[in-house]
From Swiss-Prot:
Sequence positions bearing Phosphothreonine: 68
Name of the protein: Myoglobin
Organism: Vulpes chama (Cape fox)
Domain Globin stretches: 2-148
Chief subcellular location: cytoplasm
Keywords associated with the record: Cytoplasm, Heme, Iron, Metal-binding, Muscle protein, Oxidoreductase, Oxygen transport, Phosphoprotein, Transport
EC number per UniProt: 1.7.-.-, 1.11.1.-
Name of the coding gene: MB
């Protein structure tokens, strides 16, 4: 299920555009996640009080967390599938501390794709989208495997 060198290059090229504004992209990803799947907000005590999109857009904490999420994901993507060292602590915290189900990782993956389509439509062609979906699926599958090792049924 690995990606070819060409697919990784497509992923990293579009990710370079994300990195010009990690906080803005991250905030938009989280807003889409919470709008499309309001149940995910329950996992974020810090953001439960944010009820409207305007409140979410005005939240510096949400922007900061979006930056954290996409910084971590970028570090994983840059490893081109050789992300064991980066993935292990992430899986550990998401399984034991935050208790984030794999399903929610699917939801945020969808939100990432939507944000890329929206913000980078001129560069996010079908082949790039397919490569990014494949990279995110690889990430989710590897997280799910770590969850299983940790005994988390998420």
């Amino acid at each position: 299920m690995g990606l070819s060198d060409g697919e990784w290059q497509l992923v990293l090229n579009i990710w370079g555009k994300v990195e010009t504004d990690l906080a803005g992209h991250g905030q938009e990803v989280l807003i889409r996640l919470f709008k499309n799947h309001p149940e995910t907000l329950d996992k974020f005590d810090k953001f439960k009080h944010l009820k409207t999109e305007d409140e979410m857009k005005g939240s510096e904490d949400l922007k900061k967390h979006g930056n954290t999420v996409l910084t971590a994901l970028g570090g994983i993507l840059k490893k081109k599938g050789h992300h064991e060292a980066e993935l292990k602590p992430l899986a550990q915290s998401h399984a034991t501390k935050h208790k984030i189900p794999v399903k929610y990782l699917e939801f945020i993956s969808d939100a990432i794709i939507q944000v890329l389509q929206s913000k980078h439509s001129g560069d996010f062609h079908a082949d790039t989208e397919a490569a990014m979906k494949k990279a995110l699926e690889l990430f989710r599958n590897d997280i799910a495997a770590k969850y299983k090792e940790l005994g988390f049924q998420g």
